[in-house]
Regions:
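Gly/Pro-biased beta-strand-loop elements
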Residues: 23-133, 308
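Short beta-strand edge/turn micro-motifs at domain boundaries
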Residues: 276-321
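Short, well-ordered alpha-helical segments enriched in acidic and aromatic residues
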Residues: 206-219
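Positively charged n-region of N-terminal signal peptides that target proteins for export
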Residues: 1-4
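Exported/periplasmic cell-wall-interacting domains
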Residues: 79-80, 84, 93-198
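Surface-exposed, charged secondary-structure patches
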Residues: 81, 107, 233-280
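Short, solvent-exposed aromatic-acidic interface loops
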Residues: 64-71, 136, 267-268, 294-305
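Hydrophobic h-region of N-terminal signal peptides that target proteins for export
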Residues: 10-20
């Protein structure tokens, strides 16, 4: 089934009242596609929760876990902390693959590992974090023990977890303490966010550059641009390329530390440019509404050729919003 943006905006209105009283993590704003899985890790409670969506979000499994030896958010390599934020699982290793690479040192990872996409773009550009090698992995034997920053579960539970994970398509929400709200409350936030994204897209597509730039924070920052240089760049582009079509597919909206992480497949078509890739928007609530504080776009042909990425590319070539 095509996962188009406009279809799910309508779907949200229909689903709000059906499951209004069900509780779910506050960070799980929207990834409402049948069969979708989101992993939610509560560091303080030492548990990894597996949420699955059919008609609504349900907690499918809960696994005891351990995290870094030191509490708090990760900022530096070697600080022994587990990062807090929104991440994706992009690579996996079986135990024998780890043994080939690490030798006897691989025993600590148990039966296998998933790579967590730390540091993500927001971590690097806005929060200036460093370090890497954060995994969800098994354990030597028995129950997991505190780690150098990874998330560890028992080997049996790791094998169970592999049944739910799709590389490139399964997000991970990591929090010090997970909070929950009724689905009806989160649905209101969904509508507000979806409306903002739709208005941003329309302003961009219609070449209304002043309206388009109004969606950006004065603190906007990427690896290449700050707000002033971005504003000048976009005004220049708008005079050269006045007609464009923008399609958004496979949208997800997740939240951590009051930052909304929006990800979608973006297909951009104009008289001079035709491209498709993953766009990430990072939004924050400011006094005058939601604002984009950073964004990043990656061409699909530069990403891992995992089944999830290939599927997203194929889907983006079909009709959408």
């Amino acid at each position: 089934m095509k996962k188009t943006f406009s279809f799910w905006v309508v779907f949200l209105w229909c689903s709000v009242f059906v499951h209004a009283n069900e509780l779910r993590p506050d960070g799980l704003i929207f990834n409402d596609y049948p069969g979708s899985t989101v992993l939610v890790i509560d560091k303080s409670a030492c548990r990894l929760m597996v949420y699955k969506f059919q008609e609504s979000w349900k907690m499918h499994r809960v696994f005891p876990c351990t995290t870094g030896k030191v509490n708090g958010d990760k900022f530096r390599e070697g600080d022994l902390k587990t990062p807090i934020g929104i991440y994706w699982l992009n690579q996996a290793w079986a135990g024998w693959e780890l043994a080939q690479y690490y030798g006897n040192g691989a025993n600590v990872y148990g039966t296998g590992a998933f790579e967590v996409s730390y540091p993500n773009y927001f971590d690097q550009v806005i929060e200036r974090k460093n370090g890497d090698g954060i995994w969800i992995h098994g354990t030597v034997k028995g129950d997991p023990i505190p780690t150098r920053g990874c998330i560890s579960i028992s080997n049996y539970n790791f094998l169970e977890l592999t049944r739910s994970v799709e590389l490139g398509a399964t997000p991970v929400i990591i929090e010090e303490k997970v909070t929950f709200s009724p689905s009806a409350v989160i649905a209101q936030e969904q509508q507000f966010l979806m409306g903002t994204i739709e208005s941003w897209k329309r302003a961009w597509e219609s070449n209304d550059v002043d309206n388009y730039l109004s969606f950006y924070s004065s603190n906007f920052l990427t690896e290449k641009w700050n707000f002033n240089s971005w504003q000048a760049h976009k005004k220049s582009v708008s005079t050269q390329n006045k007609r464009r079509r923008i399609l958004l597919n496979d949208l997800s909206v997740l939240m951590s530390k009051n930052i909304y992480h929006v990800r979608f497949v973006q297909t951009y078509t104009s008289s001079s440019i035709n491209d498709v890739g993953f766009k990430h928007l990072f939004l924050v609530k400011e006094a005058d509404g939601l604002k984009i504080i950073s964004e990043n776009w990656t061409p699909l042909n530069q990403l891992s050729p995992s089944p999830a990425f290939q599927y997203a590319y194929k889907e983006s070539q079909q009709n959408s919003m």
